[in-house]
Amino acid sequence: MVQDIFSKSAVASVKAQRISPRKARLVADLIRYKTATQALIILQTTNKKASGIILKLLNSAIANATNNNGLDATKLVVTEILVNDGPTLKRYQPHSRGRAYPILKRTSHFFIRVSEVSLPSVNEMTSKETVKEPAKKPSAKVEKPAEAKAPKQETSTKKPTTTTESKPKTSKAPAQKQAAKVAKPAAEDTKKPVKKSTTTTKSTKKEGSK
């Protein structure tokens, strides 16, 4: 299987690109095992310096596959992409007291391989699938009529209120009313205190003094 994949593949490489391999691998991991069309879209929308380098390299690999090997561009997949360390350029930055700090300018080597992978058609995928038995339809259950429940008797916790019947007022006879009116002034006269006559006492005192 591996030999078949490599026999229908094309490669492209570029060396000594002025970029750190650690930063370039971040973009390379995005397109690994992706189709060629998906990889192109990812690289065009990724805002990284390495995306421009890898995009040119991928277009070169696709052109090699279609022109040199006669492969179908729609079936190409990025089966391998490598980013290796290139030669490091050493520079120095001068500092005070005669000191010099080193500067390492790293470079990277890129390698990419695209292979033609024949994806199984829809008919092959359906033929391999086992035919599932049709699911049994559940038998319709006969629903029993719902029995009417007897209403619950509510037990009231309130105590029964005793109603006192008001007795009807007895109307007095007109004769009794007149007798009551006559009796009232007589009773009022008896209640009034009788004033003693002071004239008699004064006259007796005067007679005694004489």
From Swiss-Prot:
Compositional bias per record (Low complexity), positions renumbered to this chain: 158-185
GO cellular component: cytosolic large ribosomal subunit
Gene3D superfamilies: Ribosomal protein L22/L17
GO molecular function, one term: rRNA binding
SUPFAM superfamilies registered for this protein in UniProt: Ribosomal protein L22
Stored InterPro entries: Ribosomal_uL22, Ribosomal_uL22_bac/chlpt-type, Ribosomal_uL22_bac/org-type, Ribosomal_uL22_sf
Region entry Disordered, spans: 123-210
Residue ranges of the TM segments: none
Biased composition (Basic and acidic residues): 126-157
Keywords: Ribonucleoprotein, Ribosomal protein, RNA-binding, rRNA-binding
One example of a Gene Ontology biological process annotation: translation
Assembly: Part of the 50S ribosomal subunit.
Family from the record: Belongs to the universal ribosomal protein uL22 family.
Function: This protein binds specifically to 23S rRNA; its binding is stimulated by other ribosomal proteins, e.g. L4, L17, and L20. It is important during the early stages of 50S assembly. It makes multiple contacts with different domains of the 23S rRNA in the assembled 50S subunit and ribosome. The globular domain of the protein is located near the polypeptide exit tunnel on the outside of the subunit, while an extended beta-hairpin is found that lines the wall of the exit tunnel in the center of the 70S ribosome.
Protein name: Large ribosomal subunit protein uL22
Source organism of the structure: Metamycoplasma arthritidis (strain 158L3-1)
Annotated gene: rplV
